[in-house]
Every structure is written in C-alpha cells, then in structure tokens.
Amino acid sequence: MPYRKLTQCEIDALVASGCEAEDWQRVEVADVGFDPTRLRHVRFSGQISLGSAVDLRDATICDCMVGDGVRIDGVRSALAGYEIGRGARLTDIGTMTYRAGTTAGNGVRVAAVNENGGRAVPLFDGLTAQTAHLMVFHRHRTETLRRTFDRIDAYAATIAAAPRGYVGEGATVEGCGRIVDVRIGDRATVCGATLLQNGTILSQPEAPT
C-alpha cells in the first residue's frame, strides 16, 4: 500500500481532535482514503503507518502498522509493536505490546509426561500430535529428534526476526487487561483475558478461534 506524509491541514485537524505525536513526520497515512476526522484523542510515538478508513479513539499507539478499516477504541496504557490486519477491532484494552526478538511462544520447551523435564517438547505453532508423540516417546531416535528440534529452532528464529507482532485480519480483541508478545491469527476473537504472554493464537477465516 502506498503511504504519504500528513499534510499540514490534516495535522491541524488531528490536533483539534485532541491527537498528538512525538513527531508528526513519522506518521504516514494511506495515499487514498485516510480521514483525520475519524481519529480522536490518540497519541502517536515512533514509526506509524495508518491505512484507509481507520477509526481510532482514546489510545496511545507506538511503532505500529494499522491496516485499512481497523477500529481501535480505548487502549488505557499502550498499543506498541504490532502490525494490525485489515478490519481488526481492538477495544477496551489495558496494554498490548510486542517486543522485537520475541518468538511468541515458538521454541519454548515444556515438560511432557515426565515433569522433571527429561522429555521436554519445544512448542511451535505447527506442532501436531504426531510430532509431539515422536519427541516424547521416541527419544532413542536421536538423529530424527535432532533434525526435528533444529527445524523448530530455525522456525522460532524466523519469528524472532520479525520487526513486529501481528493481529490478523478481522480479528477482535476486547475487554482484555494485558497482552504481551502474543501473535493473533486472522478472525480470532480474544475477549476478557486478564493476561496473555509469549504465545500464538492460531486462527484462520475458515476456522476462526
């Protein structure tokens, strides 16, 4: 999507609506379809990209890419480090942040069967029952396990290399307290969570979570 800098008239309209920015030059907007009158009491910091027809109110937004038709209403602390997909809805949230270098739960080892940790399984968002069974009950297949673990670690590294977290297209996040280092899939609904940290919520349009 092509972006452009704000015009002075748009900046004046935003300021009149109670919006502010550390540096307006770091706020980019969709070349077509951006309407400053749809933003109220929003504070921007860092690098910001805003799509067309966004509806933003009562929020502090830092280093985010906000897609077309996104609605954000009521972020009490901060929304930081996310790419927010087209048509997503984020309302009544305490804080929602994503730090560069996190793996969103991918590669984290958890004890399975043996709680002393002798059969730790690395989690990742493509984990199947068959792969988990292999890692827990076939420890003698050392070369197969090594290759499996290496693939999972390599995948986790690709997640860590991403500059931002992700909220999927058409996702809804509402009434949540604190969300930290969590990736959220397309069409997912997250409602009333007190704390979510270091994880991935898998979802897709044909099978929403």
Model-derived features: positions:
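Terminal amphipathic alpha-helical/low-complexity segments used for targeting or macromolecular assembly
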Residues: 1-165, 169-170, 176, 187
